[in-house]
Regions:
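N-terminal capping/lid subdomain adjacent to the active-site entrance of alpha/beta enzymes
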Residues: 2-196, 201-203, 207-210, 214-218
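Catalytic core of soluble alpha/beta enzymes
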Residues: 169, 174-285
Length: 285
């Protein structure tokens, strides 16, 4: 773990919210998202160095809305003013605060603190966790969702022209047969560098999820994310056992204990680790 070269005194905390319209709405099982409503936190040290943190309001992930996040941030702010940071362990101030849950808000504060610590020590942020980077870049995943198949194919072709190679096809709003046909049509016009996953966001019935899982590999899918309700762990384990591709948990991951349980019980083959649901990256580390 990185050792701070000097103590950092927090002088001020500024809080902002911003609603950002999306160019195109994203349709998932049970919800349509047409804007990003984000919380921004700016933490300023006595040296006037500052760190920025951000988190999206995500009611389906953390139960938080932007107005509630703003109020929670005002509450947390009082615990940081005049706080002296001496090590990364001082990030525990967020976990130890009286504020219950509000993990998205806490993750925005944590990123701002990490950004501030990195700047005060003149290093890139990743070096707080590791001395060397394992990779210099990662691909961006492009969503394919919520339109007619002809519109989705047009969007997919445009994304290919823009250089995207990794795609997540949103499924679960239709029956399995319809979504399998969608995936087949999209993957068929991709090239050999394309990678496709399917994400049901808990939208399938057990029967449709089973049918999709059995045939996913044949339509070009590499892994299948959150096929049914996360609470139906035994049924998800059954789907994982006979799925033609690896399965992935997402809505079922809200804590490190969830991560451990999913692995120990082989509920799914892997998981989507969103730090917003854990209260920040340090907890995941």
């Amino acid at each position: 773990m990185f050792t701070l070269t000097k103590d950092i005194l927090i002088k001020e905390v500024e809080i902002y919210t911003l609603k950002i319209p999306l160019n195109k709405p994203i349709k998932m099982a049970g919800i349509v998202v047409d804007s990003a409503e984000n919380l921004f936190v700016k933490i300023i040290s006595q040296n006037d160095t500052y760190g920025w943190g951000e988190a999206s309001s995500a009611p389906t992930m953390t139960g938080e809305f932007s107005h509630g996040m703003f109020s929670a941030a005002l509450f947390l702010k009082n615990f940081l003013i005049n706080k002296n940071l001496t090590s990364l362990n001082d990030l525990d101030i967020l976990k130890k605060s009286p504020l219950y849950e509000n993990k998205g808000t806490k993750s925005a504060f944590e990123i701002a603190l990490l950004d501030l610590i990195a700047k005060e020590n003149n290093i890139p942020l990743f070096q707080l966790f590791a001395s060397q980077s394992k990779r210099h870049s990662i691909p961006i995943i492009k969503m394919v969702a919520g339109k007619t198949i002809s519109e989705e194919l047009d969007d997919f072709k445009k994304a290919l022209d823009e250089g995207f190679t990794k795609f997540k096809i949103k499924v679960g709003s239709n029956d399995a047969k319809t979504d399998l046909n969608r995936c087949a049509s999209i993957s068929k016009i991709g090239h050999d560098k394309c990678f496709f996953s399917a994400d049901a966001n808990e939208g399938f019935s057990h029967e449709d999820a089973a049918e999709f899982a059995k045939n996913a590999k044949d339509v070009g899918i590499s892994f299948f994310e959150q096929p049914i309700k996360a609470s139906e762990k035994n049924k998800i384990t059954e789907i994982t056992a006979f799925s033609s591709v690896p399965t992935c948990s997402d809505e079922g991951v809200h804590s490190i204990n969830d991560v451990i349980e999913i692995g120990d019980k082989s509920i799914t083959s892997g998981l989507s680790l969103k730090t917003i649901k854990l209260g920040g990256a340090y907890e995941a580390y």
